[in-house]
Regions:
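The alpha-helix within a helix-turn-helix
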Residues: 59
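C-terminal regulatory/oligomerization modules of transcriptional regulators
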Residues: 1-6, 126-153
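Short capping segments at the starts of secondary-structure elements
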Residues: 50-54
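Short alpha-helical elements of helix-turn-helix
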Residues: 10-14, 34-45, 67
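Helix-turn-helix DNA-binding motif, specifically the short coil turn and the N-cap/start of the second
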Residues: 65, 72
Length: 153
């Protein structure tokens, strides 16, 4: 079944990407106004919710590669928003935590970010949101399966 000249699945992808772009732009507004980048936000958010973490644990939790985590942590450290502590038992391991200043600066940004996302979803019922999550999860898993052979070439 074609929709104009765009296949239905491709059209659905375009709709999804446009919505994602709009919500992402909205959600980034308070982050950028606070002088933070998206990577900075991800690192601060995981530290807020999970507490102090080793640098190598942060990346997988926030979908950032190790280099991006290091750059973000360095930037946040220079701003006084995080502290870094080397492990006594293994000097290669550095644990990162939010400082009081980091918590004071980040909490209002996080609250604004969360409120904007909530407003973006206000016309979506809880049932529709659950259905959307289920469908997106299904699509994501299928796409991962389809890309597995390409990864092993």
């Amino acid at each position: 079944m074609e929709r104009g000249k765009t296949p239905e699945a491709a059209h659905a992808l375009l709709v999804m990407l446009k919505a994602l772009r709009a919500v992402r732009h909205l959600a980034l507004t308070p982050i950028l106004k606070a002088g933070l980048g998206e990577s900075d936000f991800r690192v601060l958010e995981v530290l807020l919710h999970k507490g102090p973490l080793p640098v190598n644990v942060i990346g997988p939790k926030v979908d950032l590669n190790p280099g991006s985590v290091s750059v973000a942590v360095d930037r946040l450290y220079q701003k006084g928003l995080v502290s870094r502590m080397e492990s006594d038992s293994d000097r290669r391991v550095r644990t990162v935590s939010l400082t009081e200043k980091g918590r004071r600066v980040f909490l209002p940004v996080f609250r604004q970010h969360a409120a904007l996302i909530k407003r973006a979803f206000q016309d979506v019922s809880p049932k529709e949101r659950r259905q959307m999550e289920e469908v997106l999860r299904k699509i994501g898993k299928r796409a991962e399966k389809l890309s597995e052979p390409a990864r092993h070439r």
